[in-house]
């Protein structure tokens, strides 16, 4: 009987291989460890890469797993085809130097037919184009030759996952689903076989015969031990066994779709659509139109259901593994998935945040297998909600903008959507370039990827610091009341416009560079832009808005300014930066839609996640200052600071660099203050009363009559106007990344707080893992048994272990990870040195004992009648190697004088030795070496039977050796040469 549920299929597979003596290994994180070339875990073999290459000791030789995977290579077709997903589970069985082709093929066929219940007569297989062995095995298992297809490297040579690692030819199993599944994509009208683009044959099992290790330059090297890496997509197997049309119709994914059906009130299989029902039955022509429109809307909605179903899984599992939405890297991919799901959600009439509402229901499906989802449910829900809210603020406006840009492109007779327009949508409306590409493709336009990248690069080149020095003094000469700051207690609030400024470009009006324009503002007449006070700002205009009240924190006290939105109905202003001039808070940005006029009341909304990280780092900076003054002394004065969402930087007066122990003590002091969870109390006092509290003032800072004092228990009390946490425990953890000097008499500390600590350690240990694996591979491949003692077998935590330990133990785990990372780094350095030393010794030993070298040198001998003289010149050999070779030469030949030289990039060295018999004939190596060293411009000396020396004049090495030979001949024969 065929298994029906996804859960049953998973357990049947794992139990099958468990019975075949495979270790059942839990799924690793979606955040891959030790491979910076991979953004995500994309295959089951990723966690086993070092086992295949031999970079680590084998804990077992057989393994099986069900691995959570994330791939976005086919993102644009996800939801539109029956089999593509971004998130999926990969069933796999693995052999590390144990079984190979015969058993792997046997297991695959046996499990497929006798345990999954597939009809053997419907199974086809593919093999690599020249893999006769695999074909022979399949034939022996009863698969006829007509159901075996040979395919090339594109289809049947797999790997590696990432830029390097194990790889090899593969063999795949396909199920023949019948001619009727061929469809319009079948080029042979039903006589096709695997390799055809149609849907008749669906691949459900891939066996990779790992025989090679690919390096980062793409070169293949034979593996010392072969291996097996199989992958069987759980969702695909379920599709075939449940005999449904797509992976989205399998039981677990269909259940998620049902949640969205309930939430939207729209049926996934809707056959009657209200939008067109009024047209039906009027006449045959309209009836045909009705059918076409009905199918179009049905297909569109079905795609939307599939997209949101797939993407919620990807996002949920990623955040559960600590991968949060961000502007770059992995986080950018997650943000992109949320935004794509939000976009498709509109086709299901979702105009408000909706993805977050079903997090708990989706977790319910998977929590037994993946308990980390339940543990992180609150964080997942909150993160998705914040991301949805952020994107929805500009989505409607962005869609309107993209429509107008598409029409402009078409009206101009163009077929390519420009990179500049795409960058405008990216920078201003938050549209990922890939999403824009997908939207314009539906409108029949190509996408200018190169142009977009060029615009992105231009934007990166603008320095944030460069504009502030020359920033327009907007408020000079104006009678302006003080802006009331609301941001200490809220990230949103209402305020009225008191002043508007328009930033007009003199030479360019490209909206795609609006952020850079604002950041490059200069006084009128001295740069490319003019800023002037106006009564209104209209759509597309860059400028600045001053409110009488705002929750936006202006840059000050080291803390960067807030970003976010100002809005009133459909009037939307995107804030790129917030600054303060005199007592006025100025919001710099661009009007995305509508118009803004003086006195208008606006809703001000600060970007929450960014503000949270700023609070962590600002409060962490105060604790750091407290630690420095407590542990180093009261001479410590703050000389400057930067508080950003990503990190903190603190400059302070101190005469010498900090020792490792001092850094450790400072870090521990801050983390202990975090652990104590002090309340963060603020008071506004007169300057005199504030000084009496002992509050620390920033050196050189000017203060008014009244100041704000921030106190954190007995750990810190400072003058500060910035935003902070409510209790120190909210900071989570603190880690010092770097200590350096910004100038004489001052020191600088760069550190991270909160989630940034987790990310820092994950990145650091990933780099260490890669370094250890690469070193171990070198040791094994180049030293063999000689290198066994210097293999690094230290425990290195993976991304999940790092996050879980920090979340469980808090700040105390920071010291553990600091010590561990430093110990591993030291071990790498020491063992690298040992590796090079052993490698050199082996090379010297091989050189000294090389029969061919010995024979060649002896062949050049000069017989004086009393003794023989041999000489040779080598490259990059040290004196010890030359001495070793000399000894072996003297073993082979009696009455021998040996003169050996070597050159490297800087100098030349020379070694002279002789048999004891020749010393009795007047040869003194110590005297001969002096003759040579004079020509080499150096020094030398030694005993009668052995001497060495060298010099910088390496070009004279041949002449030096010739001189020694001549002098030796004269001594031995009594004749002048």
UniProtKB/Swiss-Prot annotation:
GO biological process: alanyl-tRNA aminoacylation
Alphabetized InterPro entries for the sequence: aa-tRNA-synth_II/BPL/LPL, Ala-tRNA-lgiase_IIc, Ala-tRNA-ligase_IIc_anticod-bd, Ala-tRNA-synth_IIc_core, Ala-tRNA-synth_IIc_N, Ala-tRNA_ligase, Ala_tRNA_ligase_euk/bac, DHHA1_dom
Classification via SUPFAM superfamilies: Class II aaRS and biotin synthetases (SSF55681), Putative anticodon-binding domain of alanyl-tRNA synthetase (AlaRS) (SSF101353), ThrRS/AlaRS common domain (SSF55186), Translation proteins (SSF50447)
Organism: Leptospira interrogans serogroup Icterohaemorrhagiae serovar Lai (strain 56601)
Record field: catalytic activity: tRNA(Ala) + L-alanine + ATP = L-alanyl-tRNA(Ala) + AMP + diphosphate
Annotated spans, Disordered: 512-535
GO MF term (any one): tRNA binding
SMART domains: tRNA_SAD
Family that this chain belongs to: Belongs to the class-II aminoacyl-tRNA synthetase family.
A GO CC term attached to the entry: cytosol
Keyword field: Aminoacyl-tRNA synthetase, ATP-binding, Cytoplasm, Ligase, Metal-binding, Nucleotide-binding, Protein biosynthesis, RNA-binding, tRNA-binding, Zinc
Cofactor note: Binds 1 zinc ion per subunit.
EC number: 6.1.1.7
Enzyme class per UniProt: ligase
UniProt comment concerning the protein's domains: Consists of three domains; the N-terminal catalytic domain, the editing domain and the C-terminal C-Ala domain. The editing domain removes incorrectly charged amino acids, while the C-Ala domain, along with tRNA(Ala), serves as a bridge to cooperatively bring together the editing and aminoacylation centers thus stimulating deacylation of misacylated tRNAs.
Name recorded for this polypeptide: Alanine--tRNA ligase
Subcellular location: Cytoplasm
Cofactor field: Zn(2+)
Keyword RNA-binding belongs to the record: yes
Described purpose of this protein according to its UniProt entry: Catalyzes the attachment of alanine to tRNA(Ala) in a two-step reaction: alanine is first activated by ATP to form Ala-AMP and then transferred to the acceptor end of tRNA(Ala). Also edits incorrectly charged Ser-tRNA(Ala) and Gly-tRNA(Ala) via its editing domain.
Subcellular location, principal: cytoplasm
Binding residue positions for Zn(2+): 618, 622, 720, 724
